[in-house]
Regions:
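Beta-strand-rich N-terminal accessory domains
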Residues: 1-39
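Well-ordered beta-strand positions
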Residues: 31, 62-63, 92, 105, ...
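Extended, loop-rich substrate-binding clefts of extracytoplasmic carbohydrate-active enzymes
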Residues: 40-95
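Residue-level marker for the onset of beta-strands and adjacent loop->beta junctions
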Residues: 26, 87-89, 138
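Beta-strand secondary-structure signal
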Residues: 36, 68-72, 88-90, 99-103, ...
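Acidic, contiguous internal or C-terminal segments within carbohydrate-active enzymes
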Residues: 75-122
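Active-site/ligand-binding surface loops and adjacent short beta/alpha elements
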Residues: 111, 121-181
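Conserved SET/PR-domain catalytic core that frames the SAM/AdoMet-binding pocket
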Residues: 26-42, 95-97, 105-109
Length: 181
């Protein structure tokens, strides 16, 4: 677990909660329940709306204990997302490691579209960027138990999924050498 200065922006999207949608929305446009919505474009080079709004706002501290912390975020009336949801996140640390638990509650009587993701970031204790961080990470190992991964197009928008293989196969605790993560 890497601490950050609470008064500075968290680098590299580290640990961001991605809601009410993860990834990207093409041109910031979507339709839900017969209505069309327009969100601000904030990823200009890809003309998309990126990673939702939850990471952009302060979260309320609900509970702080030695072994865990619980935070909540209630969506304000946001351009392109006029829905009222609350997300609660609990981060608990024990002898088995870190457990993250998230719940979402719709505070309104109308349906609310939402999706969820997290933006994990692996830190090797060094503060390099670009090719230097790639070189520092290559001897590290990562084990991830999954059978498929999401495929993306040139704008990093999801196009489907396929079985893990080659650089995407992390089931046997390989080094990250040549994987470019």
């Amino acid at each position: 677990i890497v601490p950050f200065d609470p008064n500075k922006v968290i680098p590299c999207c580290n640990g961001w909660v991605l809601a009410p949608y993860p990834n990207r929305v093409t041109n910031g446009q979507y339709s839900f329940d017969g209505e069309d919505y327009q969100m601000p474009i904030d990823e200009f080079d890809r003309q998309s709306s990126l990673h939702g709004y939850a990471y952009r706002y302060m979260w309320e501290l609900v509970d702080l204990q030695e072994s865990h912390v619980t935070l909540s975020w209630r969506s304000p009336d946001i351009a392109g997302y006029p829905f009222d949801i609350t997300i609660t996140a609990t981060y608990a640390l024990d002898e088995n490691g870190l457990t993250e638990t998230f719940t979402v509650h719709n505070n309104d009587s109308v349906k609310a579209p939402w999706a969820f993701g997290i933006h994990p970031w692996l830190a090797n204790g060094k503060h390099a960027t670009g090719q230097a961080i790639t070189a520092d990470n290559e001897p590290c190992r990562l084990e991830l138990h999954c059978d498929t991964h999401v495929t993306v197009d040139e704008h990093l928008l999801p196009t489907g999924e396929e079985p893990v293989s080659g650089i995407f196969d992390l089931r046997d605790n390989p080094t990250l050498e040549g994987r470019g993560f």
